[in-house]
């Protein structure tokens, strides 16, 4: 770099022609000089070209069709056919809209708005797994947030903008990637307000959180601290536009069937109390499919929040047969995972008898944990054998079968035959 002194010859930028006195810095190369202003201009041009390249790359990337999305979901999620179809179409339309965003912004008068998704279903029915599988298929950053830990900004608890901070961390602070990610907010039903009427007192973990999430979901510029942590007045922030982030909210909404039934009886749709058996899962699933926005509002979600979740998919409670399928059929089924784990122990084979699978499914049903509870039941069942196996030699197979009362599960260890020694000829 040349110094600004009176003793030396005056130097000029080779690009803009300004003298060293007119700029802050002048950097020298072999018979050439460039000023700080031209460097800034070059950096701006490069940044713009990189953004154009990223947009073009996204446009060229083949977006899986709804059929292809559904096929991938089928590999990991058992049942829930209606929910998978709804999700496949909604996610396809969302990312198709993002791919054609530049066309929309170039003079087209039709603006496509975002359709966020609400998943309603009992614990362990596959809500989180569906969202995770979609993010993995589309290769976009994905983060899960628990609505019960969120509070309004300024109160003790987790700020809603922390969700975007986690999303940014997932993609190594790549802002462009984060702005096309997926956010799954679980337990959304737990932030419903306690009554139909707006409360006079401040509800910082219920309606207040809905109001805060509303801005995030409909599209705002979130200010995220670059290194995480709490915000400070004098620090710089990374700006994240949430307009194109897909938000998927999930919740069990326990008791909403009574609200739907009450509305249906008034309107004469035919869900009479005499006809419905409370314990009949099929009837309950049928009722949930008739959910309307007014039912969600009566449950405790504010109308504006319901309006920002136009795509609603209901998931059925899993029955015994579905839980057995979940154990053995998906691409990463739990039984396949434990088989692989046992095979690492000197090639030991793990086998579950049919009655053992039935017993595991029934345990999960009795605990009301759905598919989520299957792993803990398997861990309990296999704990002793996994503890002893590394210390036992010559094991070829472990068989899990049900006990005499069909609820107990017991492992049977099968040893390999020792090879017979050949007789030496005299």
Curated annotation (Swiss-Prot):
Pfam families: AAA_2 (PF07724), ClpB_D2-small (PF10431), zf-C4_ClpX (PF06689). One of its GO terms (molecular function) is ATP hydrolysis activity. The keyword Chaperone applies. Signal peptide: none annotated. InterPro entries: AAA+_ATPase (IPR003593), ATP-dep_Clp_protease_ClpX (IPR050052), ATPase_AAA_core (IPR003959), Clp_ATPase_C (IPR019489), Clp_protease_ATP-bd_su_ClpX (IPR004487), ClpX_bact (IPR046425), P-loop_NTPase (IPR027417), Znf_CppX_C4 (IPR010603). Keywords: ATP-binding, Chaperone, Metal-binding, Nucleotide-binding, Zinc. Belongs to the ClpX chaperone family. This is ATP-dependent Clp protease ATP-binding subunit ClpX. It comes from Nitrosomonas europaea (strain ATCC 19718 / CIP 103999 / KCTC 2705 / NBRC 14298).
């Amino acid at each position: 770099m040349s110094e600004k002194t009176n003793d030396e010859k005056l130097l000029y930028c080779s690009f803009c022609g300004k003298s060293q006195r007119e700029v802050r810095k002048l950097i020298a190369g072999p018979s050439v000089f460039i000023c700080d202003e031209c460097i800034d201009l070059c950096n701006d041009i490069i940044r713009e070209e990189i953004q154009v390249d990223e947009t073009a790359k996204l446009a060229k990337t083949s977006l899986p069709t709804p059929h292809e999305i559904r096929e991938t979901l089928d590999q990991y999620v058992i049942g829930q056919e209606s929910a998978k179809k709804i999700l496949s179409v909604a996610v396809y339309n969302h990312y198709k809209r993002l791919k054609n965003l530049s066309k929309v912004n170039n003079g087209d008068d039709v603006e496509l708005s975002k359709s966020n998704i609400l998943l309603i279903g009992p614990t362990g029915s596959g809500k989180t797994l569906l969202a995770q599988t979609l993010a993995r298929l589309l290769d976009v950053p994905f983060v899960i947030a628990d609505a019960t830990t969120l509070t309004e900004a300024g109160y003790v608890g987790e700020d809603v903008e922390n969700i975007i901070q986690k999303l940014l961390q997932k993609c190594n602070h790549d802002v462009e990637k984060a702005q096309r990610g997926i956010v799954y907010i679980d337990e959304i039903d737990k932030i419903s307000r306690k009554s139909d009427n707006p409360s006079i007192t401040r509800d910082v973990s219920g309606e207040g959180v809905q109001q805060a999430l509303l801005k995030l979901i409909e599209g705002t510029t979130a200010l995220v601290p670059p290194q995480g942590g709490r915000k400070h007045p004098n620090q710089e922030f990374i700006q994240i536009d949430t307009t194109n982030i897909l938000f998927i909210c999930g919740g069990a909404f326990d008791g909403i069937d009574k609200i739907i039934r009450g509305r249906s009886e008034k309107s004469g749709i035919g869900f009479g109390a005499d006809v419905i058996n409370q314990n009949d899962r099929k009837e309950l699933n049928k009722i949930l499919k008739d959910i309307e926005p007014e039912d969600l509002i009566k449950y405790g979600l504010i109308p504006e929040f319901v309006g920002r979740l136009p795509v609603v998919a209901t998931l059925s409670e899993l029955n015994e047969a579905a839980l057995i399928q979940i154990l053995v059929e998906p691409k990463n089924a739990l039984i396949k995972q434990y088989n692989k784990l046992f095979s690492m122990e000197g090639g030991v084979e793990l086998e579950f008898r049919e009655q053992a699978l039935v017993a595991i499914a029934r345990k999960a049903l009795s605990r009301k944990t759905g598919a989520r509870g299957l792993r803990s039941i398997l861990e309990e069942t296999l704990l002793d054998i996994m503890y002893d196996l590394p210390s036992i030699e010559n094991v070829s197979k472990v068989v899990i079968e049900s006990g005499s009362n069909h609820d107990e599960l017991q492992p049977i260890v099968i040893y390999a035959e020792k090879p017979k020694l050949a007789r030496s000829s005299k």
